Amino acid sequence: MTGIIHSLLDTDLYKFTMLQVVLHQFPQTHSLYEFRCRNASTVYPLADIKEDLEAELDALCRLRFTHDELGYLRSLRFIKSDFVDYLELFQLQRRFVEIGTDDKDRLNIRIEGPMIQAMFFEIFILAIVNELYFRRLETPAVIEEGERRLQAKAARLKEIAAAQNPDDPPFLISDFGTRRRYKLAWQEHVIRTLLEAAPSIVRGTSNVFLAKKLGITPIGTMAHEFLQAFQALDVRLRNFQKAALESWVHEYRGDLGVALTDVVGMDAFLRDFDLYFAKLFDGLRHDSGDPYVWGDKAYAHYQKLKIDSRTKMLTFSDGLDIERSWALHQYFKDRFKTGFGIGTNLTNDMGHTPLNIVLKLVECNGQSVAKLSDSPGKTMTNNSTFLAYLRQVFDVPEPETP
């Protein structure tokens, strides 16, 4: 039986862009990732899929990159030849992943090992958990409902394409839904359907396998884990964001220039995002908090630095659907170029409640790391003392409890 994952390209582009920096600049880094399901309840306990998950992981760890896949990676201008040579030898090691269950029938997953291994497991494991969970819930009615919703999205994108003013910056969306997809075949069907409906709007996908297969642009730069790692590397905690951005610049020399802003919140990020970074980076990515407030703060920051914000891009990727994306585009289009990464709403909108699952970096080199985020529910760490210290260092107040 073929595993759920049958290609090591079946992951998000930013795994490759981050891994390249890790390999070149801090290859000895050790990391710990922990799984969390944020759903209050599920149709059946996730513990029930443990045995199948173990088998899928065994299959995943037998995969290697093919010459064709390596050739595709070499064709991306920001991927360096020595990194592709490393990937030719690469194989995920099963011993770095522990799977267990607790007395509440919850699934426990820990990935602990070298960051150049541990970081690469995340998307694969989340996609496997999703597919195993929803496989047991699939009926013809579920697929029918998914198709009905997909066709409504395609029709809406056609309307938007017709309504766009050619003098405005374009409205562009990308698929960011690999980690929470229903299954790979459905993700491909969604992208093909929307591409056919509105080729001027659908910019690409974060999924490298599907970008290669469909001949569209792979999208992505960095994730929270990249910046968080610098909380435990050899820099003062106060300077970790600057060190991470500097490291990125050193690797990519102006390429892949979208910076993620919410590891310790937008206000703390902007204090570090000085004229040098603001000129060098093409734009910013929003992943938590009120997107309108966030974008207005970005605009004020560029104004203060006397940078024309119309030359910069705001990328939004937090819980979006087509309507929210279009509304944000209307609000910001006269001040910024915009881009929208839509995840679960594209790849797992089938009528069931989607799983809100994450596999987050919680330790690096034996030291706690954390994300404060602009949305309190997205804060994640295994060390509340470190979290309090991080708040103090970056002057981030405790979120108000309702």
Swiss-Prot record:
Q: Which HAMAP family match?
A: NAPRTase (MF_00570)
Spell out the Gene3D superfamilies in the cross-references. nicotinate phosphoribosyltransferase
Q: What is the recorded name of this protein?
A: Nicotinate phosphoribosyltransferase
**What is a GO molecular function of this protein?**
nicotinate phosphoribosyltransferase activity
Q: So which domain of life are we looking at?
A: Bacteria
Name the source organism.
Neisseria meningitidis serogroup C (strain 053442)
Example GO biological process term? Answer: NAD biosynthetic process via the salvage pathway
A Gene Ontology cellular-component term: cytosol
Q: Which CDD domains match?
A: PncB_like
Spell out the post-translational modification annotation for this entry. Transiently phosphorylated on a His residue during the reaction cycle. Phosphorylation strongly increases the affinity for substrates and increases the rate of nicotinate D-ribonucleotide production. Dephosphorylation regenerates the low-affinity form of the enzyme, leading to product release.
What reaction is this protein's catalytic activity?
nicotinate + 5-phospho-alpha-D-ribose 1-diphosphate + ATP + H2O = nicotinate beta-D-ribonucleotide + ADP + phosphate + diphosphate
